[in-house]
Structures are given as structure tokens and as C-alpha cells.
Amino acid sequence: IEEPSGSMVVDIGGGTTEVAVLSLGGQVYSRSVRVGGDKMDEAIMNYLRKHQGILVGEMSAERIKKQIGTAMAPEHGDGMTVTVRGRATGDGVPNEVEINEKMMAEALADPVGEIVEAGHFRRRSKLRGQFPSDYLSGLGFANLFV
């Protein structure tokens, strides 16, 4: 962080995410958004209800997130899979389904998109012109895993 290049730090908490860029020994940008692990868990629960017809609780959603949660779908195939147990939405009978990383990338697209947006500052007027374009283009979320 002492060099004239930047390092982006993303701290995803339960209720908020902090995004900061550190350079030349200090913080040159920061933003907080009200998106965190809790919203991701909620997104997983909603996805499973809507697309798989199964109801799961918060603890199950968090376990799924930790096992196969990803911001980017695998380049080839569907990625790793896990078995999820819950209750069928129609009759409440215990049920299980197989879900994969590709599904989780889709489920997490909205909350991850909000976090990614917090990291996009190239167009923000207070930073425009302060950094060379290659400095800004080097910052991003290419490998954001939850």
C-alpha cells in the first residue's frame, strides 16, 4: 500500500460490506453498502424456494453459501454440488435436491452485484482524474468468492 498502485479490500460482514482502496500508505476510497452475508443467505433461500421448490432455513442457507457459494459461475460445467434437505413448498413433506455452483452464482447475483457496484468508482467525480486509467482498471472483483 506504499506504492502508487492500489489494493482493494472488501470486508463482507453479516449486514454490511465495506469496500476500500488503499494506496500510498492511506485510504483513497471507501464505501459501505447494506449488503452482507445475511442478504446472501436470504437470496439463497428465495432461489431454492422459487427454482427448486424447497424451503430451507437460515442455517442451511449459510452452510450452502460456505460450501459452494460463489460470485462467478464455473467456466465449464456446473461446478461442485451439494445435497440440500428441506421441506417441499407444495405439501411441506421433507425433500432433498442437488444444487451446484452455477445455481449459487445465479442465486447470489443480486447481492454480489450490489457489492461489485460499490467497488466501481471510476466514474465517481471525486476520484476522476486522480489516478491513471491502468490503476483503476486493475481494481475489480474478478475472483470474489463468498
What are the language-model segments listed below?
Residues 11, 44, 119:
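Residue-level signature of catalytic and energy-coupling elements of molecular machines
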Residues 23-109:
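Phosphate-binding glycine-rich/basic clefts of nucleotide- and phosphate-handling proteins
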Residues 14:
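Short, glycine/acidic-enriched loop or turn micro-motifs at the edges of active sites
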